[in-house]
């Protein structure tokens, strides 16, 4: 892996490798800070590597290349966190916001009402933190899709990754209530209508005993002729269980919401793994274990 960059089949020396690596990083449109966070090193250390002020080991080359390829704009699949809900067994909301989220509570808006039977909440953008005088409820963090994307910007500024944040949350006693992982299909690898048909024909081998499918073509009000065949969504597993899958044609969603032509949509399909309670906890534990192995 460390010899990924070559000229005419000849392995590059360290100086050439560093230059080629820096060029590829810029080509991908990735900042030093963003790449350093993904690689688990400081931005300063990466800067010193790219300026040849420190030697780069073979092990470091592998780590940097693996991190860089996660930002490859031509990658057919990308993964992201799409929903996070964590309960903290404390009434000290200031501690959660300051030490776990590493945000400034003074810049958050306070409302004296909440959801999930909480009595009040603080929010900034789509990042919500609920609290209640009930000790059993504690403090609840909720990040939906937009909230996850916004929180990623804060994590980047903090030079932290999702794995750093989740580790901090679990160490502080955080209890995973829900976690959605989304895999974006950028090339149309999945044929959702075909998957739906295979489920109907009992050609799908799975531990899940149920599936549901929906077609949302009636929502499209433009000139498309084949409305009935548009916008397929497939659920595998019971929506009431602690784990189920949702697969849908993201390109149609982007067309309906944003008016992006279907053929130009950057994401063709999305595969979501929705996990609750213990299933969410074990998924986070496994993700953290894998991230530690690669550090």
Regions found by a protein language model. Give the residues of each.
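Structured, helix-rich domain cores that form ligand/interaction pockets
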Residues: 2-16, 27, 70-293
């Amino acid at each position: 892996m460390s010899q990924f960059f070559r000229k005419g089949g000849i392995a590059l020396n360290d100086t050439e490798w560093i230059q080629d690596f820096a060029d590829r990083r810029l080509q991908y449109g990735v900042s030093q800070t963003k790449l350093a966070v993904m690689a688990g090193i400081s931005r300063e250390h990466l800067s010193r590597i790219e300026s040849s002020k420190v030697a780069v080991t073979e092990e470091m080359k592998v780590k940097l290349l693996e991190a860089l390829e996660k930002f490859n704009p031509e990658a057919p699949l990308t993964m992201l966190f799409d929903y996070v809900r964590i309960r903290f067994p404390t009434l000290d909301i200031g501690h959660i916001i300051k030490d776990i989220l590493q945000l400034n509570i003074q810049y958050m808006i306070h409302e004296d009402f909440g959801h999930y039977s909480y009595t009040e909440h603080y929010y900034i953008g789509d990042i919500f933190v609920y609290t209640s005088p009930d000790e059993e409820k504690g403090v609840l963090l909720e990040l939906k899709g937009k909230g996850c994307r916004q929180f990623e910007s804060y994590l980047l500024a903090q030079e932290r990754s999702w794995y750093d944040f989740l580790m901090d949350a679990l160490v502080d006693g955080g209890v995973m209530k829900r976690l959605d992982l989304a895999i974006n299909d950028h090339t149309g690898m999945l044929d959702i209508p075909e998957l739906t048909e295979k489920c109907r024909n009992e050609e799908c081998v799975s531990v899940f005993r149920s599936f549901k499918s929906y077609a949302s073509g009636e929502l499209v009000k433009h000139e498309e002729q084949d409305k009935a065949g548009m916008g397929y969504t497939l659920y595998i597993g019971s929506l009431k269980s602690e784990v189920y899958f949702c697969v849908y044609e993201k390109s149609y969603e982007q067309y309906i919401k944003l008016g992006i032509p279907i053929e130009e949509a950057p994401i063709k399909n999305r595969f979501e793994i929705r996990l609750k309670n213990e299933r969410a906890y074990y998924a986070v534990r496994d993700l953290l274990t894998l991230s530690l192995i690669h550090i």
